[in-house]
């Protein structure tokens, strides 16, 4: 299902890129950052270099939660053509993210990424999903902390975990997969009350 979604997204994107006039809306959450570096990396590739560069709208709020007070038409008026520097940084970030060695991501975080203002914080948060010396990642630590505080209702655990994130880090489906992995691993981190 996810593959079909991305294939459909890519087909729409490629068609639009060839026609020109692409405007990418981007907000701080990691999901948007990953889409942004993937798309801009394509524009910086051999296939994308002949296309008109896209325009970028950077907004400091979650697009899915936008209200009238966010004045989306004014945000659109602030759009700017993506710069060569932004294309290069995006390509390097995408390469580091998709590399088999996580040290490339760590090295990327030492670079100046300010031309894509939300990228560094998104990649830093993603890097926290690598296990620490105890073998667990940040999301798992947050879940264990919330559970040890007495909360056990699944929706509340998700909500409480999201309150520890700025900006929002993952959606509910991804979160439930983390919990499932914690319950079903060879050495479970969570035991369900009903077994």
Which functions belong to the PLM regions below?
Residues 142-150, 160, 178:
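Short amphipathic alpha-helical elements of helix-turn-helix/winged-helix folds
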